[in-house]
Regions:
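Gly/Ser/Thr-enriched, mixed-charge loops and adjacent short helices
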Residues: 1-101
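Predominant activation on well-ordered alpha-helical scaffold segments within soluble catalytic domains
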Residues: 26-29, 53-60, 91-95, 99, ...
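Residue-level marker for buried hydrophobic side chains located in beta-strands
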Residues: 42, 107-109, 200
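Short, glycine/acidic-enriched loop or turn micro-motifs at the edges of active sites
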Residues: 48, 113-115, 123, 206, ...
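Short acidic, glycine/serine/threonine-rich loops at helix termini
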Residues: 53-57, 78-82, 116-122, 160-166, ...
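Short hydrophobic/aromatic-enriched beta-strand-loop microsegments
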Residues: 63-70, 125-130, 168-176
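Phosphate-binding and adjacent anionic-ligand microenvironments
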Residues: 105, 145-350
Length: 350
């Protein structure tokens, strides 16, 4: 087909990309010309992915001392026992690195570097929920929070909603998926607003979107710099002190392999155990049970107020997942994983 005769066709152009890496780093550093990270030592986990070259460059140029791990991408080792999802499950590995090098905190990216989470000096995870709260406060104090609103998904911790209500920050909840968060932010951006505003949204996983006239999607490195900026401006001595102000509710997320995806509403034993959980946990705030859309797994989120512990929730999660497996013809003893969302780490079966 001769495209030259097609109406409405716009031709691209070839761009010499030899300096694009440097230009991106320059852009991030220039955006924070007044920010100095001197005196901070950061442990960077780059997931053997996209952040491997960029993250050490950016934080070093901003003045931080950096300790870098998992920054040797070889094509097949991306996210392999590295990066944000690994650290959420096994936080002890990064904590050992931080202790050895006496780092102030850890900064952890995923493979394509659109997500970032932190680890405070005590070894606790600072995830997307914490980051939304911290950044929401920061941008509102600066008078730059678009529509005084933060957007997140149904998987957010319940304490986040309470936190924003106490600070008169509006909260919009969407379905799970960054595309739904982005769609709500785009609606806010389309409304008349003062210049210099930032639309803030994201997910518990650490996918944070800072939307303005020049930025429209998640960028883990940019989010990380803003989070550290917010921490330094908070007056708190440690990241742990800042993150603890959010008081997250006990929350677990479980996943289990299933042989077949049978309508959960038709599984009598599953519904019976679900009703039992609701009766046994008077402080239960949310129970979300669904099949994965992409894997042969069932996923469960349990959350309760502080009358209950993470361990209590984990016990109930194992029981409900086992019931789903039994009712779907899944072999006994198949994969079940329960993640402590509140503090990080996998919870062993009791």
């Amino acid at each position: 087909m001769d495209l030259s005769e097609s109406s409405g066709v716009r031709f691209g152009r070839r761009v010499d990309g030899t300096d694009l890496r440097e230009r991106y780093v320059d852009h991030l550093v220039d955006e924070h010309q007044d920010l100095s990270l001197k005196g901070l030592k950061l442990a960077l986990d780059c997931a053997n992915g996209a952040a491997s070259w960029f993250a050490p460059q950016v934080f070093s140029r901003l003045g931080a001392e950096v300790v870098v791990i998992n920054a040797s991408p070889a094509g097949k080792n991306i996210n392999a026992e590295a990066g944000s999802e690994h650290v959420r499950r096994e936080p002890q590995d990064l904590k050992a690195v931080m202790d050895h090098f006496d780092a102030n905190f850890g900064v952890v990216f995923d493979g394509d570097a659109d997500r970032v989470i932190f680890m405070d000096e005590a070894g606790n995870l600072v995830d997307g929920d914490h980051m939304l709260a911290i950044l929401g406060d920061y941008f509102k104090d600066q008078g730059k929070l678009l529509a005084d609103t933060v957007v997140s998904t149904t998987m957010r911790n319940g304490a986040l909603v309470k936190y924003f209500a106490e600070r008169e920050i509006n909260f919009i909840e969407t379905r799970v998926g960054d595309k739904y968060v982005m769609a709500e932010l785009q609606k806010l951006m389309a409304q008349p607003h003062p210049s210099g505003q930032t639309g803030l949204g994201g997910e518990q996983s650490g996918h944070i979107i800072l939307m303005d006239d020049s930025h429209a999607t998640g960028d883990g490195l940019r989010s990380a710099v803003f989070l550290i900026r917010a921490f330094l401006s908070s007056g708190k001595e440690t990241l742990a002190e800042l993150a603890e102000s959010i008081h997250k509710y006990p929350q677990v997320i479980a996943s289990a392999v299933v042989a077949e995806k049978i309508d959960l509403e038709t599984l009598d034993r599953v519904q019976s155990i679900r009703e039992g959980i609701e009766a046994d946990l008077p402080g239960l705030t949310r129970l979300n049970l669904r099949y994965s859309g992409t894997e042969p797994k069932v996923r469960l989120m349990l959350e309760a107020d502080n009358r209950h512990t993470v361990e209590e929730l984990a016990s109930q999660a194992f029981a409900l997942c086992e019931a789903v497996q039994a009712e779907t013809g899944t072999s006994e003893g198949r994969f079940i994983e329960v993640l402590n969302v509140t503090r990080g780490g996998l919870i062993p079966r009791a």
